[in-house]
């Protein structure tokens, strides 16, 4: 991390950012009961700004939390060409954090199965998820923490609407399909711009994201650009949209599984009241 002892302005800004990220992360954890006493939290560390920030903020909160929980960092090395294997172990050893490097050659599997030019996202995601879930069970982790933030959640909402025909996003807390694992997203309330600024000041050893150029990544970038443009033109729109997914009114949507539209009946009592008023 850069030496801020002779740069009071930058030090003040870093402290403000850290306090804001701690407050929002703590609020998300409390709102969704993400971490409980005795939990073993497996923090998934990719080497990007989000997961580095998540690890640091969780360790901050751990030091002052009214409950006891442990943290173990896990990196999934998918054997992508050019991945710098030494960076994360060196960083985590210096930090004094318990960690595991999980080596799974999912890259070769995807390349072998998926035809050239076809999207690899679905298979890659399933293999990655399966590896992490399996390892969480192996080490007895009770929670799996991912570094998705508020902007990721909104981008996923629009991706699912535009390209999947579904009104869904990334929940801050999720039970896996088999009911064995609970996935949490402690940064759910945090802005990407705050995380970006914080990571720059902390000088994390960022591992460049080896984007595969898939259709899903291209679509996500289009949605990201759209949301950033909206926020620039109408400041506060992002906050409003995030508030919207916390204030859902099923009776004003069109999903018959969420609301019994067919069963709606006029209320005789309402007519009686109207008659009384008209008299």
Swiss-Prot record:
Name of protein: tRNA-cytidine(32) 2-sulfurtransferase
The family this protein is said to belong to: Belongs to the TtcA family.
Keywords: 4Fe-4S, ATP-binding, Cytoplasm, Iron, Iron-sulfur, Magnesium, Metal-binding, Nucleotide-binding, RNA-binding, Transferase, tRNA processing, tRNA-binding
A Pfam match: ATP_bind_3
Entry's Gene Ontology molecular function annotations: 4 iron, 4 sulfur cluster binding; ATP binding; magnesium ion binding; sulfurtransferase activity; tRNA binding
Ranges spanned by the short sequence motif PP-loop motif, renumbered to the chain: 46-51
Disulfide bonds: none
The keyword Heme appears for this protein: no
Enzyme class of the recorded protein, top EC level: transferase
Species: Marinomonas sp. (strain MWYL1)
UniProt EC number: 2.8.1.-
UniProt-listed HAMAP family: TtcA
Catalysed reaction, written as an equation: cytidine(32) in tRNA + S-sulfanyl-L-cysteinyl-[cysteine desulfurase] + AH2 + ATP = 2-thiocytidine(32) in tRNA + L-cysteinyl-[cysteine desulfurase] + A + AMP + diphosphate + H(+)
Presence of keyword tRNA-binding: yes
Record note on cofactor: Binds 1 [4Fe-4S] cluster per subunit. The cluster is chelated by three Cys residues, the fourth Fe has a free coordination site that may bind a sulfur atom transferred from the persulfide of IscS.
Major subcellular location class: cytoplasm
SUPFAM superfamilies cross-referenced by the UniProt entry: Adenine nucleotide alpha hydrolases-like (SSF52402)
Assembly: Homodimer.
